[in-house]
Amino acid sequence: MLEKDFQRTLIQDLKQRFPGALIFKNESRQGLPDLTVLYKDKWALLECKASKDASHRPNQDYYIDRANEMSFASFVYPENKGDVLNALEQAFRTHRKTRFSKSE
């Protein structure tokens, strides 16, 4: 599956799981994550990959790590999509941060 196809299905899943969420596709400059998700008073950054073994661009690890310290951020690919969505759902429900390990 191509990354753009995976991203499209992920966006559909996010809209279904988080009704009313604002989902923005970010410019792919400087390694910024692909998606910003705003839901109620929470936010998340998600970097889509076609597979677990897909390469990372410069700065992607930095931005995911920094954003995860502030809120929720993760690399997401077909092999971990369910786990990431479950962790994101938990993070959006709680008043404290829920972190998901980027290297699973």
Predicted regions and their residues:
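Catalytic phosphate/metal-binding cores of nucleic-acid and nucleotide-processing enzymes, i.e., regions
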Residues: 1-104
